[in-house]
Amino acid sequence: MSKKDRRRVFLDVTIDGNLAGRIVMELYNDIAPRTCNNFLMLCTGMAGTGKISGKPLHYKGSTFHRVIKNFMIQGGDFTKGDGTGGESIYGGMFDDEEFVMKHDEPFVVSMANKGPNTNGSQFFITTTPAPHLNNIHVVFGKVVSGQEVVTKIEYLKTNSKNRPLADVVILNCGELVRRKKRQHSSRSNESVSSSTSTEKSHKKTKKTKMKEKKRKESDEVEQLEIGTVVPEAELQLSSVKAEDLPDEPDHQNKYLMRRSKTPENSRKGKKEKQRQSPHRFSRRDIGHRLNRMRRTRTGHKIKGRGALRFRTPEGSSDHDGSRTPPHWRREQNRVITLDELHRLQEKRKAYELEELENPKNDVVDKAKTGILLNTSEKIEDKEERYRGKSEKKENRHERSRHTTRRSPEHVTRHFVKEKNRHKVDEVGNSEDMKQTKRDRRGRADEKEKVEVNGEKAAAMDELNLDEPTVEVTLDSAEDIRDSDDEAIRIHLLKAKKMAEEKTKQEAKMLEKTGDKEGRDQKTISEAKQKDSAEKDRQHREHKNDELEKRAIEKQDKDQIVERDTGSKQRRKSDSKEHRGKTDRKHRSKSIEEDGRRSTSREKLDDLKRKETSGQKSQADSEQTVEAKTNVVDSNSDNSKMSVNGKLKEVSSTNKENEVSEQKDLKAESTKSEEIKQQVNEVSRKQKGGEKPKEHKRNERSRSRRRRSRSNGRRRRSSSRRSRSRDRRHKSRSRSRGYVRRFEGWSRSRRPTRRELYDERMRRERERRRSFDRYSDRRRTRSRSARRDSDRHSRRSRKRSPSSSSSSSESSSSDSRSTASSSASSKRSSSSDSSRSSRSRSSN
């Protein structure tokens, strides 16, 4: 089969009742003949009714139930309409054909399935390339025209289950047939002329040959829908009747004239009246109009020329209600509530069922139909009256709002009227509810009658009495009558035929039902006996299981009691061990304190010895200073005796030397005082319990040794403990870290994670504080050392002039030595402090 012989199919689609357009699809008969035949027969409806569902195998009236943007649109479920139904012409489902064609371009038609070899009637049209569907879904066609209709459906709004909010219905579908064009007389003339030209023996060129080929090809093709003037054997007649077509208007081409709906005479009359009116240009009239148009509902003026915005005022309550915009009101009037729609549908269906079941009782039917029609007309009249009243009231309120402010009396009147109106509506609704309840009872009785026969139940299923609740938006209440689908009409016609056949078969069915009832009773009694025997057996098994469970529970309780007694004895032994440990700790602490006291006494003795040695060194330094002064005096006398002409210069130099020596004496005295103060501070610290740095260092080293010894003891004791615990409880293993972790807690209660975390954070804070204190001390010491070095440098500069004697040099060297000794002592103290801080951080 060539590509020219491929068949074409069309689908006329409506969106929310409006015709969207036609989708034309070309089928790949040569690649997937079985799937193409299934799709073609479902489009034409020539396959009859389904074997499983019992419904007509036809896409007409079905919907596109699934729409995914930038992916595909899916339809073809003519049985349920929600994607869970559908049936092929082969009965149920059929196997996949070869996956030759791929989903490598948009607008490809492919079969939907639930898995391999589960093709039914559902199909989908891709809107983008979808290579992930290759070798899963069978491609059997492509969209030739109507791509814009597919994109329009694709961009519809959907709910959470990808179902479009607007109803997308296949209004009509079928096959397109090719036909040859009629040959015109001009072509026949050309053929005659060509024959004469051959007689004259003119040679044909390539161009003429090509032209003839093109003519032959153009003769083939023109597409026709089924239902146009073609041979009856090839085509199927259309279902459109002449009665259904609307009447032609009087002026067919009147829509081409761009005129308004109002007649010309009335418009001319209005214009003339406006021209003739005396107050047309009066200022008073203009002001009145402006005031009338530009006031809020509370009476305030609206300034400005812009469009009015509808909003609730700030001071008003929700009960008061703002002015609803006119376009909102129009839309609200168009919408009908679900309850009203269900009521009307139920009445219609009840009426149709009564007609089908009781065709003889014409008088009763007429009376019932009259009642139903009257009730529906009353409801519609009530709705229209309510709409008219609401519009009039709104206009009247608007006029009163524009002219005057609302007084409290006016507000009370308004609320009283609204309450009365609501009461009237509630009374009307209650009457409608009573009527609907009666209708429901009647329908329930009818259902019971129908369920007597199996075929009547099938007819009920076909009519779909229990339809899903869907919100429907109609242009007016009258459109509800004309909103029946063609599918429902077809179902009704079939139901009429079935009713005629049922009257003939009722006698046979009654006999069959009697036999079936007897058999059913026997089977039910047998099933009851079997059920009772099974229940007794299950009851006995259940009792046995309960007894076994109780025995097992008793055994478990006894074991738990034995374990508890053993654990109590172990706790007592553990508490004894804990007491022994605490006693040992207290003893070790007392021994350590005695050692510390002895070391502190030794340190005090050392300090006293150092103080005595310091005092001796001070006395020696004073003696040396006196000797130096004597030497200076003798030198000055010799200089006076030797040099008689320069007495004034020598006297000036002597004075300078004396001043420098006095300064040195003062500095040495201040140093001696500082040393005494330091000694006093050390003695105070010892009395108050504080210790100097050297003593602290010695104590730390000793404490480290003790710790190492105690750690060794702890390790031994912990290893012994762990062995004993392993013997008791193999599951619980206590390491050294685990014991140290719970040191401060009693054995009866172990700490929680939160408590451990708090303890860790507290230690961290203490460590940081100690480090901060140490760093502050170090900073202050470094500053004091800098100051001392600066002072010494200044003094050395003052003593450095060349005219100074050897005595000054010796004094400066002494001062340098003292400064260096002090600096070295400070460095050693700082290094000791840094070591101590490191040891703390490591601890």
Swiss-Prot record:
Its EC number is 5.2.1.8. The keyword Isomerase applies. Keywords: Isomerase, Rotamase. Residues 201-214, 268-282, 289-308, 578-588, 702-739 have a biased composition (Basic residues). Residues 186-198, 801-843 have a biased composition (Low complexity). Residues 178-330, 378-453, 495-843 are annotated as: Disordered. Pfam families: Pro_isomerase. The keyword Cytoplasm does not apply. One of its GO terms (biological process) is protein folding. One of its GO terms (cellular component) is mitochondrion. It catalyses: [protein]-peptidylproline (omega=180) = [protein]-peptidylproline (omega=0). GO terms for molecular function: cyclosporin A binding; peptidyl-prolyl cis-trans isomerase activity. Residues 614-642 have a biased composition (Polar residues). Residues 241-253, 316-330, 378-397, 406-453, 497-577, 589-613, 655-701, 753-777 have a biased composition (Basic and acidic residues). Residues 10-175 form the PPIase cyclophilin-type domain. Relatively insensitive to inhibition by cyclosporin A (CsA). PANTHER family: PEPTIDYL-PROLYL CIS-TRANS ISOMERASE, PEPTIDYL-PROLYL CIS-TRANS ISOMERASE D-RELATED. PPIases accelerate the folding of proteins. It catalyzes the cis-trans isomerization of proline imidic peptide bonds in oligopeptides. This is Peptidyl-prolyl cis-trans isomerase 1. It comes from Brugia malayi.
